[in-house]
Amino acid sequence: MFNFFKKNKLNKFQNTINEIHQIGNTVKNYSDAELKKQTHKLKKKIIQNSNLTEILPESFAIVKEAIKRSTGMILFDVQLVGSIVLHQGQIAEMKTGEGKTIVAITTGYLNALTSKGVHIITVNDYLAKRDSELAQKICSYIDLKVGLITQSMTYEEKKRAYDCDITYITNSELGFDYLRDNMAIEFNQIVQRGFNFAIIDEVDSILIDEARTPLIISGPFEIEINKYKKSTSIANTLQKDLDYEIDEKTKNITLTEKGISRCENMLNIDNLYDIHDSWIQYLLNSLKAKDLFLKNQHYIVKNNEIIIVDEFTGRVMQGRRWSDGLHQAIESKENIPIQQENKTLASITYQNLFLLYEKLSGMTGTAKTEETELDKIYNLEVLEIPTNKICKRQDLPDLVYKTEYKKWQAIADECFDMYHIGRPTLIGTTNVEKSELLAKILMELQIPFNLLNAKPENVSREAEIITQAGRKNTITISTNMAGRGTDIILGGNPEALSKLALTYYLQNKLGLKVNYLLNNIETQITTIINNYVLDMQELDIYKYKNIDLKKIQYYIEKIIKNEHTKYSEEEKLQKLYLKILSEYKNICYQEKQEVLKLGGLYVIGTERHESRRIDNQLRGRAGRQGDIGASRFFLSLEDNLLRIFGGDKISQLMDNLNIDEHTPIESIILSKSLDSAQKKVESYFYDIRKQLFEYDEVINNQRQAIYAERKRILQSSFTRDCIIEYAESTIDEILTAFYREDNINNKNHIIKKIYQLLNLTENFHFNTLYDMNYKQIQEFLYEQLRISYDLRESYLEQLRPGLIRKLEKYYLLQQIDKAWQDHLDKMALLRESIGWRSYGQQDPLVEYKNEAFSLFINMVRYIRQTVTYLTMRSRLIINVNN
């Protein structure tokens, strides 16, 4: 029934695809110049009230032809279906190697015709650069501008890239640019335009895996270094389960009564929780650093710095830091310099960032297991796109061992067998530590392998490792890094192998240290290289300062792409590349045939992840584009997933099993428990993300209001109206307090406050106001406000023309930013403490909304009052000559 429903859903696109092919028969006869003109014609149609869906067949036919002319690739029908699904604002689930990059360009072209811009979002800089280069190649045929955003760009460069028709960017840089734009002091510092349409590559990774991690821009904040060092010292003496308890599920630590008493004695204080000199947060962070955040698993140490490792991708997150003092506690634990703590200046979650878009869509190979969440939070439907060729991968049953030791032994034995028959094998591990453990075992068995994990020396070899992972006799150990954005080609990737051989050749010729080697350079390739004698001094590479590996790689790319080389030696180098490429194509083809006979790529999983999606991503490395392949998970009853979430059934099973440790367990109960454990974890984290979204929605509405006000001020060239508006609101608030007050002295004090605020010099007793009603007093004070402000404006204009406008904008932006930063701190404290309300039979979310609203109103009042006071009362010392 379900398959019938799915098939019908896809069948509705058949008429559109037929129409695309029909129009394509005409488009293929266009000259390059005629093809280029079609974009302008389609844009005119949109201006004349055509909607995008009406011109979809025509636009897709044009892109299809541009792709064919620029790359030689022909779009399959399933890719066109994927593009239609993206245009409709849905998620296209497409398997590895099915051409997601091309699918995004096709949809991007159609939606870019509105001239409002399209963002194509990737998970890392490498993919953004790679995909943008392909898009530029294609879009040069259809007169469309493609931009790329990188972290190192200037304001002007970013603005130009955002103003392009299609812009490639990473999810983190998009978020940080949004936050920076909303902290800009000048309007010309804003780089982004409106959020029109986004296509997210690896959409599940960004919208689900990273949903719990907010993007934060922070500023330095003074810290007490001695407290961190002392807390680390104390944490090392405390005993687990005696002095403190750990909840591994929630990653929380609680001190026991005995632990609290011990800490207070060691610190010689009466109260760990003393509001004026609190130690509790320092101690809890030190305990988390000791037991929950482990080196080579959650972070690595490089150049005396703690660098976070992303638990989902296995990649290092350079420049990111844990908040609330946790990062400093880990620095103290590792005995490296403790850096300043940070105060949050601006933040946003990915959930709310992507909900800013008018239309959102995404692509991934694994989203079906999370379709409920994607639908409920983002209103995105997941549609499975069939593969162009039937997937022939064989997913073998899990092998479960009693102990972790026996599991690793079995994996090593399997690798030994695969190596000796020549079958390429990829082993996926959950962290750096486990990948290095397996590496040591294989070294003892004298099995050659490639290791890919977050450590810098291995990351630098990523291209080389992935290039060869599908070759015969290749064993590759990898963390989750190999699970995203990479295609493992059986027999090897001839283009990448040729570039590596050429890089190695140039490094040798330039006398540079070769920090990596191909597993082996074939004899025929070495012969080709040795037959080419280059005069190195004639090469343009000598123009580069401090030649290194990156510059050599960039230089080779430039020569390969450039059809008209400058020098004869560079022409030789180009010919050498083509000769190597031709040879590697033969080698890789022969190897592919041999690997296919052996059963294709074999993927081994060493532990079930918290999410079935991550497991499916690893499996998806095998069986690319209809190739054969296989996957199998080797597990143990001591694995984290089973230990933390498995429940009592697993424990009982462990006690009752009396079989040999060497024998893998196959049990229906165990398989069900395994699936149940994974579903429990997924459900648990979904609830956390759902709750986070509900709470974050409150602050998001406040953020939108503050940022809208800030933008209004930035865009305004006449901020006087804004100051007057703020001052009038402040007068209204004070007048309301005046009428509520019964005490005469208090009333008199309130009137004095108004006079001070408005910088009025005349003493005015409130008795004279008795005969006036609220409206009359209000109008009188409004009039006094304008008179007072006119005088101040006139005075400052005489000192320096335009000074008052600059002052107004400065005070407005400064006070909004300062108040918002303080408000974020208060909201964080409220969020941490609001859970206790449930003990008083109150709904924490309802209470949070009420209190957050009160805090927001108080913040708005504070902004109005301080801006009014600063503008009306501040004394300026001005150097008129400067």
Curated annotation (Swiss-Prot):
Keywords, ordered alphabetically: ATP-binding, Chloroplast, Membrane, Nucleotide-binding, Plastid, Protein transport, Thylakoid, Translocase, Translocation, Transport
Protein topology in the membrane: Peripheral membrane protein
Major localisation: plastid
Subcellular location, record wording: Plastid, Chloroplast stroma; Plastid, Chloroplast thylakoid membrane
KW Amino-acid biosynthesis (keyword) present: no
EC number from the UniProt entry: 7.4.2.8
GO terms of molecular function: ATP binding; protein-exporting ATPase activity
Substrates-to-products reaction catalysed: ATP + H2O + cellular proteinSide 1 = ADP + phosphate + cellular proteinSide 2
Pfam families recorded: P-loop_SecA, SecA_DEAD, SecA_PP_bind, SecA_SW
Residues holding ATP: Q79, G97, E98, G99, K100, T101, D487
BP terms from Gene Ontology: intracellular protein transmembrane transport; protein import; protein targeting
GO cellular component: chloroplast stroma; chloroplast thylakoid membrane; cytosol; plasma membrane
Source organism, top-level taxon: Eukaryota
Family: Belongs to the SecA family.
Function: Has a central role in coupling the hydrolysis of ATP to the transfer of proteins across the thylakoid membrane.
Identification of the protein by name: Protein translocase subunit SecA
Organism: Gracilaria tenuistipitata var. liui (Red alga)
The gene coding this protein: secA
